[in-house]
């Protein structure tokens, strides 16, 4: 049953995404970016969340919304699944996602990403990528936007050892903005491999880390805060799925070496 529901979700997700982008693309050059964000990006995100709930049985629960600060902010989120690249969009005010450059090359999709002024990085050019990412993030945050980064740079399987990259500390030190850690357990329900599983993805928006801490202190704190909360959410999710809350052996990491997270 899970495989059937997963297939139907993916079919409806990719079909609706393609058709919506195709219908709206003639109007894309004429739209102000903020209008495009509300009309296209947020509608797409809410539609996908609806499909996840009604077709795949994947619900969501968010705690800690009161910790979201207005104005310039660096958001550092755990990355286990494709889920958070969609479902986190409506939670924040006009966030600029930091993402891998290759996503910009996808026909149609890349045009919308460019219009949203997300920040692409070339993960093969480490020092140049850090410089470009920082400059772009500084420009966007000066306009009052919030920057969202995945500190490990890529999806990590549930239970895999953390692999936080220096890029998040570099960005934090350069922006001079507080950092909002975000923990989640989405990898239990939308894994990279295998079917989606019904259940409740839990997101916890943690208390913000103040700006201008020493980078080493910040790096230790952001990893500690995210990983401790994620471990608790994963254990809760596993218990709800009827699994051992302590988990088994972790899958091997999927990728390594992102300069930006």
Question: Which residues make up each language-model segment?
Answer:
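Non-catalytic C-terminal accessory region of glycerolipid acyltransferases
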Residues: 3-4, 130-261
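N-terminal membrane-anchoring alpha-helices
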Residues: 1-61, 260-261
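Glycine-rich helix-loop-beta junction characteristic of Rossmann-like nucleotide cofactor-binding loops
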Residues: 64-68
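A generic structural signal for well-ordered alpha-helical segments
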Residues: 52-53, 113, 140, 172
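Generic preference for hydrophobic
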Residues: 62, 75, 97-98, 203-205
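Catalytic core of membrane glycerolipid acyltransferases/transacylases, capturing the structured
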Residues: 20-42, 53-55, 69-126
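Short acidic-hydrophobic, aromatic-tinged amphipathic segments that line or gate anion-handling sites
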Residues: 62, 119-122, 211
């Amino acid at each position: 049953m899970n495989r059937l529901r997963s297939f139907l979700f993916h079919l409806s997700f990719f079909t609706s995404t393609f058709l919506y982008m195709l219908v709206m693309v003639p109007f894309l050059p004429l739209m102000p970016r903020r209008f495009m964000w509300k009309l296209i990006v947020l509608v797409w995100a809410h539609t996908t969340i609806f499909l996840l709930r009604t077709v795949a049985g994947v619900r969501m629960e968010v705690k800690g919304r009161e910790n979201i600060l207005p104005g310039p902010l660096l958001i550092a989120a755990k990355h286990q699944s494709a889920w958070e690249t969609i479902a986190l969009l409506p939670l924040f005010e006009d966030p600029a996602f930091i993402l891998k450059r290759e996503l910009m090359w996808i026909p149609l999709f890349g045009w919308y990403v460019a219009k949203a002024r997300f920040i692409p990085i070339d993960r093969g050019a480490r020092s140049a990528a850090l410089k470009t990412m920082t400059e772009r993030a500084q420009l966007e945050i000066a306009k009052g936007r919030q920057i969202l980064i995945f500190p490990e740079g890529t999806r990590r399987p549930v239970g895999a050892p953390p692999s936080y990259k220096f890029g998040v500390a570099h960005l934090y030190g350069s922006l001079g903005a507080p950092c909002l850690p975000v923990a989640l357990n989405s990898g239990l329900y939308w894994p990279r491999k295998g079917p989606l599983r019904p259940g409740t993805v839990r997101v916890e928006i943690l208390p913000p880390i103040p700006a201008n801490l020493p980078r080493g202190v910040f790096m230790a704190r952001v990893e500690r805060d995210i990983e401790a909360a994620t471990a608790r959410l994963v254990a809760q999710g596993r218990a709800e799925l009827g699994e051992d809350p302590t988990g088994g052996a972790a899958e091997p990491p999927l990728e390594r070496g992102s300069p930006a997270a």
